[in-house]
Amino acid sequence: MTYLLIDNSNTRTKFVLSSPEALLPERYMVPTREVSGERLDEVLAGVRYDAAVVCSVVPRVAEELKNWIVKPCHFLSCDSRLGVGIDYPHPRQIGADRLANAVGAAAYYGYPCVVVDFGTAVTFDVIGPQCTYMGGVIAPGLASMGDYLERNTALLPAIDPQEPSRVIGTSTVEAMQSGAVYGYRGLVKEILARLEGELGVRPAVVATGGDAALIARGVERIDHVDPDITLNGLRIAAGLNL
């Protein structure tokens, strides 16, 4: 059995093949704004799979994928078999990506656990001591800080967030990078400390997403950086639902 795992985020949509036991080397990516049946036919021409599992946070793309996929397919939701309970008053509000992260984290790192996913938004998702999804925190992503300043000021430029050489910037770009990276690490540390205090127990902390490695370098409380936690959550969910 070969699965096609589809992780549709706001910025990019990933397509990864897997067996029931592990991810396979074949990986494809399409910018989310470009996803269409025609584009997928082009990028994934010749890709063979038996069934697909999807986590999508973009309704337009979800519809495109429903029309494009002809094999058995499961869209991850709170109604899926997850191997993780849901202790949340409005489960249909939970993003499919957050559910996939919870599934992957519980399987690979145990529980309690916090998954920090650095994307367009940063999400903190909490899996409690009883292996239940409890909720979490949503904040603007790292890139959003620089984008906001560029859009709403006359003279500040766009920046590419990267490790500052020092805190005291000696140019506008250096000062913005320092504010973004060090400020963001402060945000992450504060939220993690408060989550741990509310849980009353020390959880494993797993970081994933595009900015995970950069931010984790300065946040000792992050135990693991795992770029594939969402995909492995999808792989596990495929085995439970297909």
UniProtKB/Swiss-Prot annotation:
GO-annotated molecular function: ATP binding; metal ion binding; pantothenate kinase activity
CDD domains in the record: ASKHA_NBD_PanK-III (cd24015)
Positions annotated to bind ATP: 7-14, 120
GO cellular component terms listed in the entry, alphabetical order: cytoplasm
Gene3D superfamilies in UniProt: 3.30.420.40
Cofactor: NH4(+); K(+)
EC number assigned by the record: 2.7.1.33
Chain sites annotated for binding substrate: 88, 95-98, 172
Protein's cellular compartments: Cytoplasm
Gene Ontology biological process: coenzyme A biosynthetic process
Pathways per UniProt: Cofactor biosynthesis; coenzyme A biosynthesis; CoA from (R)-pantothenate: step 1/5
Family annotation (InterPro entries): ATPase_NBD, Type_III_PanK
Job of this protein: Catalyzes the phosphorylation of pantothenate (Pan), the first step in CoA biosynthesis.
PANTHER family cross-referenced by the UniProt entry: TYPE III PANTOTHENATE KINASE
HAMAP family: Pantothen_kinase_3 (MF_01274)
Name of protein: Type III pantothenate kinase
Source organism per UniProt: Akkermansia muciniphila (strain ATCC BAA-835 / DSM 22959 / JCM 33894 / BCRC 81048 / CCUG 64013 / CIP 107961 / Muc)
